[in-house]
Curated annotation (Swiss-Prot):
Protein name (database record): Initiator protein NS1
Catalytic reaction equation(s): ATP + H2O = ADP + phosphate + H(+)
InterPro entries documented for this protein: BoV_NS1-like_N (IPR054766), Helicase_SF3_DNA-vir (IPR014015), P-loop_NTPase (IPR027417), Parvovirus_NS1_helicase (IPR001257), PV_NS1-NUC (IPR049901)
Cofactor entry: Mg(2+)
Length: 776
């Protein structure tokens, strides 16, 4: 083109825009002070400009004055100071004296302040540090202005009013270097969804086209734009003005503004004709949009979560996937995710909110019983279960108790929403209650010490544990609602009261919970309604110290067996156990005949009716007759029963003497004997599911074949014994009978028979062997 203007066809990115105000409020009234401080020698020209006529009238004096004031007025000096300061700032960012950047500075006379627009783009300036750089930029601009003011001191000292402006500039400079900008520098910002402000990058060429260039010139508030702007360079529709413009260190003259604007519109920035408008021009009629298109285009955009929300959602998914219920579970399962969320503002509070949301989700989805089965799936009840053993020791039917616990935990027991384990110390009540609540895991505890907020920990829980329960008149009324499963509002510390839904309660205590204590009085008014809400089990037998703790999996085994076998509702419980109503004191168990509550007899399993252990079954084939293996070398004269003979034992030993058993177990068990392998109950407990691999399949086939061989050998042995017993035996003659009686005939004729031994020494025969075993 025919002009030499500082045309920008490309601008460095990213680009940000600043606005710097001149820090003097009464600058319009004291405009002459700015003339003398920043542009000395231009006072007379500015006064003459006030008296010039506006265009379209021809005024040669006006043209000469405007040419003389080209870049010497205080607006131009202010724009130069801003450019030098911005260039210095970019040099610091890029660590060079000659930074590679693009800078546009335009000073303007506003309604309140003299200000300067700065467009700067280049490496070293980013979205993160552009906002922080405001104080540095303001300090550099104020330093340039104070240096400009000091040039006047070479000719004359400051007037008092001039000194006031100078000291104000120095004060703003000191505050800027300390980080305080006041309201003297601003940057274009945007607000995010959280309300935080961030630096807004801009399109510099479009900003030049639409905001910087289409303005008329005004160099003094006492003049007018039609005086300071020539008719050829007048923007008809522009209502804003500028004072001076600098692009990359060169002034943009008034006569070149329109040409530069036209070049930006036609060549640099694509216009509407080049866009995808179907070939229509900028002023042509746009296509009509139908109603259906408006409806379809009125769809809401997808919400994009920020970093904090994504972390919270990930943590909530982890809690649901891994069943994380408390802070300790988060530390052990996902510490990396926990640390990232802790690093966010208010991270501890966010973690509490996530856990609270997960608790609400679990309570809405599960009951205490279903969540217990969710945590402990596919449990098989065995006769070595400690929960089964404890209930049998205390005299209860463990299956009936398990049925009742299932109904309570599943919220199907009607008004009886509480199970109370009552008894003295060391009877297993806390052991049993702790196993139940730890199996559920999401439980709350009642705290007597915090008297104002006793049930503070009971909200958003699947089950409540009331350890060492004690009724007091301060909390007996809400306690009756909670024990009966009625919804009520409870007080929570530092929060409003919350609604407590029906939550099963487990109590372990050695106090009388039906007596209400208040001050120095004990009341029994609430005893009847409390008993209607509580199902009490009395544990009165102390357990040995070697009993051990009941694990949550053992509780899950018992409850899962009862849940699969019985109808876990109030009607099903009463129908199964033939009850008209469920009493407050749980009924004692009634064992079947020959069934025992002794844990030493647990190998054969338990009864599915009374819960007792099944009796032992013995096999006579593993025993043999001792008399058949006794020889004369093993003869013991003490077994004769003769008190006159010599005996080394004392009378006390004779009194306590118990004859030896006539049967004994064979020391070496035959390999085909049923006792040589595991029992049938042990085999069934071991192979309750299919083998998981080839090794387990091989072991299963070996044990199964061994059981088949044992069964076959036992049947063959029984048949052989039966056949031997049915064979005809020859009738013994008198001589044979005499030999059996210990009488032999004499070798010499006429002599009496010889008696070999006394009848007292005769061993019992096979016929009376069973009568003498274990008897005297």
């Amino acid at each position: 083109m025919a002009f030499s203007a500082p045309v920008l066809r490309a601008f460095s990115q990213p680009t940000f825009t600043y606005v710097i105000k001149f820090p003097y409020n009464n600058w319009k009234e004291d405009e002459h002070l700015l003339w003398s401080l920043l542009a000395p020698g231009t006072e007379s020209l500015m006064i003459q400009l006030k008296n010039c006529a506006p265009h379209p009238e021809d005024d040669p004096i006006r043209e000469d004055i405007l040419c003389s004031l080209a870049d010497l007025h205080y607006g131009a000096v202010f724009a130069k100071a801003c450019y030098i300061a911005t260039s210095t700032l970019m040099g610091q960012k890029q660590r060079t004296l000659f930074p590679r950047c693009d800078i546009v500075c335009q000073s303007e006379i506003g309604s309140d302040f003299l200000h300067c627009h700065i467009l700067v783009g280049g490496a070293g300036l980013s979205k993160r540090n552009a906002k922080i750089s405001r104080a540095t930029l303001l300090g550099l601009v104020m330093a340039e202005l104070t240096q400009r003011c000091k040039l006047l001191l070479a000719h004359r000292p400051f007037e008092p009013a001039e000194a006031t402006i100078y000291h104000e500039l120095k004060r703003i400079e000191r505050e800027a270097w300390s980080g305080h900008t006041g309201n003297w520098v601003q940057i274009l910002q945007y607000k995010d969804k959280r309300g935080d402000l961030h630096a807004q990058p801009i399109d510099p060429l479009r900003f030049l086209k639409h905001y910087i260039l289409p303005k008329n010139r005004l160099i003094s508030p006492s003049s007018k734009p039609d005086v300071c702007t020539s008719p050829d360079n007048w923007f008809i529709l522009a209502d804003k003005t500028y004072s001076h413009t600098i692009i990359n260190g060169l002034p943009l003259l008034e006569r070149n503004r329109k040409a530069y604007l036209q070049e930006l519109e036609s060549e640099v920035i694509p216009g509407p004709s080049a866009m995808a408008f179907g070939g229509r021009g900028a002023w042509e009629q746009l296509p009509e949009v139908g109603e259906q298109r408006l409806i379809t285009s009125n769809t809401s955009t997808a919400y994009k979560a920020n970093k904090k929300e994504k972390l919270m959602l990930n943590l909530l998914d982890k809690c649901d996937e891994l069943n994380l219920l408390v802070y300790e579970d988060l530390v052990s399962a996902c510490p990396d995710l926990l640390l990232m969320l802790e690093g966010q503002p208010g991270g501890a509070r966010l973690i509490e909110q996530v856990l609270g949301m997960h608790h609400i989700k679990v309570c809405a989805k599960h009951t205490a019983l279903s969540f217990l089965f969710h945590l402990h799936p596919d449990q098989l009840l065995t006769s070595s279960n400690k929960a089964l053993k404890l209930l049998l020791i205390q005299g209860y039917n463990p299956l009936q108790v398990g049925h009742a616990i299932c109904c309570v935990l599943n919220k199907q027991m009607g008004k009886q929403n509480t199970i109370c384990f009552y008894g003295p110390a060391s009877t297993g009540k806390t052991n049993f209650a702790k196993a139940i609540v730890q199996g559920v895991r999401l439980y709350g505890c009642v705290n007597h010490l915090n008297k104002g907020f006793v049930f503070n920990d009971c909200r958003q829980r699947l089950i409540i544990w009331w350890e060492e329960c004690l009724m007091h008149q301060d909390w007996v009324e809400p306690a009756k609602c909670i024990l009966g499963g009625t919804e009520c509002r409870i007080d929570v510390k530092h929060k409003d009261s919350v609604l407590l839904q029906q939550t099963p309660v487990i109590i372990s205590t050695n106090h009388d919970i039906y007596s209400v204590v208040g001050g120095n009085t004990v009341s029994h008014v609430h005893a009847a309604p409390l008993k209607e809400r509580v199902l009490q089990l009395n544990f009165m037998k102390q357990l040995p110290q070697t009993f051990g703790e009941i694990s949550p999996s053992e509780i899950a085994e018992l409850l899962q067996w009862c849940f699969n076998e019985y109808d876990c509702t109030l009607a099903g419980f009463k129908q199964k156990w033939n009850l008209d109503k469920v009493p407050n004191s749980f009924p004692i168990g009634d064992l079947c005949p020959t069934h025992s509550q002794d844990f030493t007899l647990h190998e054969n399993g338990f009864c599915s009716d009374c819960g007792g252990y099944l009796p032992h079954s013995a096999d006579d084939s593993v025993y043999t007759d001792v008399a058949s293996e006794t020889t004369s070398g093993d003869y013991d004269p003490g077994n004769l029963g003769d008190t006159d003979g010599e005996d080394s034992k004392s009378e006390a030993s004779e009194v306590d003497y118990c004859p030896p058993k006539k049967r004994r177990v064979i020391s070496a068990t035959p390999p085909n004997s049923p006792v040589s392998g595991p029992s049938l109950s042990t085999f069934l407990d071991t192979w309750q599911s299919q083998p998981r691999d080839d090794d387990e399949l091989r072991i299963y086939e070996e044990q199964a074949s061994q059981f088949q061989k044992n069964t076959k050998s036992t049947s063959e042995r029984e048949e052989a014994q039966l056949g031997e017993s049915q064979e005809p035996q020859p009738e013994p003659d008198p001589t044979a009978w005499g030999e059996k009686l210990g009488v032999c005939s004499s070798q010499q004729p006429g002599q009496p028979p010889i008696v070999l031994y006394c009848f007292e020494d005769l061993r019992p025969s096979d016929e009376d062997e069973g009568e003498n075993i274990g008897g005297d």
